[in-house]
Amino acid sequence: MSDLKAAALRALKLMDLTTLNDNDTDEAVIALCKNAKTAVGNTAAVCIYPRFIPIAKKTLREQGTPEVRIATVTNFPHGNDDIEIAVAETKAAVAYGADEVDVVFPYRALIAGDETTGFELVKQCKEACGDVLLKVIIETGELKEEALIKKASQICIEAGANFIKTSTGKVPVNATPEYARMMLEVIRDMDVAKTVGFKPAGGVRTAEDAQAYLAMADDILGGDWADNMHYRFGASSLLTNLLNTLEVTEETADPSAY
């Protein structure tokens, strides 16, 4: 297997296959869940709006892939600084049955010099999550500066985040390798690689992109770090590209073909 194919297979199993469109329907979410099951393995998770959690859970169970995790979003996409609302949304997501919650950090508050709101929001959302995984979206493309990106990452980690995530995918600039490096360096420098993961989201579209991101993680945190409890790709169109790279066609995907 070529290096690119090996990276594509690895990336596929680290994907949070995502649909977060305003016009999402039950049908779109059912289709997403079906796509999470491929001939070469399942994606790590699907990522959907909270109201679709019950239909996703049912679909994943009925197709025999209950191990695919369900991630959802809160305080999304604007990262407002109302802690009470963010916590209420997070509690509701957990009650719906989410396995993972991706909450948006109040990044504008941090830009304005307020570090406390972000810390409290993440801390209280983590308390609301209990054992449910909390990923915190810092919106790198809006923070822009290395000092702010690193500060946001540190605050999230200190407040109990299980993952730090680049972006909502709803702003002009989302994940970039440069931003990813800054965030991975914080995980390394704070010595929290065992307990904190990383998720680039938005802009990771090809097997080559995924290969470069994984190579960076291997370089900074070691070759065995980026497993599915420490690394995820937030993406939608990436899956098709990975399957094409792996030369998986509809025929190979048909179980009756075996």
From Swiss-Prot:
Catalytic activity, EC: 4.1.2.4
InterPro entries on file: Aldolase_TIM, DeoC, DeoC/FbaB/LacD_aldolase, DeoC_typeII
Major location (coarse): cytoplasm
Protein keywords: Cytoplasm, Lyase, Schiff base
Catalytic site positions: 102 (proton donor/acceptor), 165 (schiff-base intermediate with acetaldehyde), 199 (proton donor/acceptor)
GO molecular function, one term: deoxyribose-phosphate aldolase activity
Localization: Cytoplasm
Family recorded in the similarity comment: Belongs to the DeoC/FbaB aldolase family. DeoC type 2 subfamily.
NCBIfam families membership: deoC (TIGR00126)
Protein name: Deoxyribose-phosphate aldolase
Species per Swiss-Prot/TrEMBL record: Aliivibrio fischeri (strain ATCC 700601 / ES114) (Vibrio fischeri)
